[in-house]
Amino acid sequence: LTTSASFLEDGNEISKITDLIAWNKYYGWYGGSAADLAKWADQIHRNYPSYKLGISEYGAGASIYHQQDSLKPGDPSGWWHPENWQTHYHMENWKAISERPFIWGSFIWNLFDFGAAHRTEGDRPGINDKGLVTFDRKVKKDAFYFYKANWNKKDKFIYIANRRCV
């Protein structure tokens, strides 16, 4: 099988060449709401029922030092990247993905925060903070435990989210 990962508009000619197609989608981070992924996927499936649809990238930035009581998105190109928004974002996106059997796969962007010299956002310049674990690999963010609870049925645990919000 051949596959393509795309950030191009839906229905672009490149989408018709490969057996499988996946799109980078950041609804709820770079515009829109976290619930928009479900609407987009349903629309693509309706318009192009023969497409084998995947999500090649999805994620939202988060700093373990940015805590808030309210559930409001951060500014993707700014410094405020609240951890609770990242968790909400992943919960909404995973719900949309897991409820749609026509989505063949999805890929979280990213397991770890990573260096990105051109970035000046989040709590430190030069870091992409969309990871589920901090750059130094020492702290697992709340969204990490959301996926662990959904994907690992053997390791029973209780995790209290928003525990850093004091």
Per-range role (PLM):
Residues 1-166:
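Extended substrate-binding grooves/exosites of carbohydrate-active enzymes
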